[in-house]
Curated annotation (Swiss-Prot):
InterPro entries for this protein: Aldolase_TIM (IPR013785), DHO_dehydrogenase (IPR050074), Dihydroorotate_DH_1_2 (IPR012135), Dihydroorotate_DH_2 (IPR005719), Dihydroorotate_DH_cat (IPR005720), Dihydroorotate_DH_CS (IPR001295)
Subcellular location, record wording: Cell membrane
Cofactor binding mode and count: Binds 1 FMN per subunit.
SUPFAM superfamilies the UniProt entry points to: FMN-linked oxidoreductases (SSF51395)
EC number(s) on file: 1.3.5.2
UniProt source species: Enterobacter sp. (strain 638)
Function description: Catalyzes the conversion of dihydroorotate to orotate with quinone as electron acceptor.
Binding site for substrate: 66, 111-115, 172, 177, 246-247
Predominant location: membrane
Protein name listed in UniProt: Dihydroorotate dehydrogenase (quinone)
Cellular component, GO, one term: cytoplasm
Keywords: Cell membrane, Flavoprotein, FMN, Membrane, Oxidoreductase, Pyrimidine biosynthesis
Length: 336
């Protein structure tokens, strides 16, 4: 109930500054009795997906808690899963500021963060301290200065390091803010990456005596033909799940709005329909052979239900959480 007042204050600030201040406060309470301040009781609605039991179908999408600093505080709000990252082998600063913009009228965000994070080792130290009782996903990417041709090495380094601590691993090949990254979604480059990831997963399963599922996160800007090829590759390589979708480069729904011409990926309500269409097409192609985690513009119970009706087993929120606050979690979980 109090979030509209908090939002009003935060929205007076630069978006990245608002994020930093919010996380400063969440860091203070995470892992302490003060977590009670943000705790919400939500209904238990268990879902089986990728061989894991999720206590409810709603997750936090990657990008909000890049370094795994506030896992417990965010978990207290009622998420069934939290995806931290994107994390890279080495720390990196990301792109120059400003790099995050609100499109308030559209309830959307444009970001060109560029995988700013403190590196995989730092993330793991934070994950070790967390007591979240839901499923923890760790989203991995490549460093900006790693040539795309050697990009798979970065994913394998991250996989090796996070495997013991992850409920599932998300492979991000769809951010528009790392030059060349999206080329990994196509043809031989995708097959080469997925083959290496599957081999590494099998190797790590032997070492750790546990199977950690791998999901691949795709872009909403794929054509139908490209989507069919991606689906075929995911099935052929026995990938465990697909996260659909990342942010879009399409600005058709926000033309003329403040910040609409900023470079970067657009998320929030403007990507809602596009991501749902991708999920529907993907579901028709996959025919249940691997599960879909639906993300993109979910800002209400109806939007979440639309993703699930289109074929998603689980859903995630990010921008909707920024615009609507923790109450959205409770509404979606209790009524989905």
């Amino acid at each position: 109930m109090y979030y509209p007042f908090v939002r009003k204050a935060l929205f007076q600030l630069d978006p990245e500054r608002a994020h930093e201040l919010t996380f400063q406060q969440l860091r203070r309470i995470t892992g302490t009795p003060l977590e009670a301040l943000v705790r919400q009781k939500v209904q238990e609605k268990p879902v089986q997906c990728m061989g894991l039991t999720f206590k409810n179908p709603l997750g936090l999408a990657a990008g909000l808690d890049k370094n795994g600093e506030c896992i417990d505080a965010l978990g207290a709000m009622g998420f069934g899963s939290i995806e931290v990252g994107t994390v890279t082998p080495r720390p990196q600063a990301g792109n120059d500021k400003p790099r995050l913009f609100r499109l308030v009228e559209a309830e959307g965000l444009i970001n060109r963060m560029g995988f700013n994070n403190h590196g995989v080792d730092h993330l793991i130290e934070n994950v070790k301290k967390a007591h979240f009782d839901g499923v923890l996903g760790i989203n991995i990417g490549k460093n900006k200065d790693t040539p795309v041709e050697q990009g798979k090495d970065d994913y394998l380094i991250c996989m090796e390091k996070v495997y013991a601590y992850a409920g599932y691993i998300a492979v991000n090949i769809s951010s528009p803010n790392t030059p060349g990254l999206r080329t990994l979604q196509y043809g031989e480059a995708l097959d080469d990456l997925l083959s290496a990831i599957k081999n590494k997963q099998n190797e790590l399963q032997e070492i750790h005596h546990k199977y950690v599922p791998v999901a691949v996160k795709i872009a909403p800007d794929l054509s139908v033909e490209e989507l069919i090829q991606v689906a075929d590759s995911l099935v052929r390589h026995n990938i465990d799940g697909v996260i659909a979708t990342n942010t879009t480069l399409d600005r058709s729904l926000v033309n003329g709005m403040k910040h609409c011409d900023e470079m970067g990926g657009l998320s929030g309500r403007p990507v809602q329909l596009k991501s749902t269409e991708i999920i529907r097409a993907l579901s028709a192609e996959l025919k249940g052979r691997l599960p879909i985690i639906g993300v993109g513009g979910i800002d209400s119970v109806i939007a979440a239900r639309e993703k699930m009706a289109a074929g998603a087993t689980l859903v995630q929120i990010y921008s909707g959480f920024i615009f609507k606050g923790p109450q959205l979690i409770k509404e979606i979980v209790n009524h989905i």
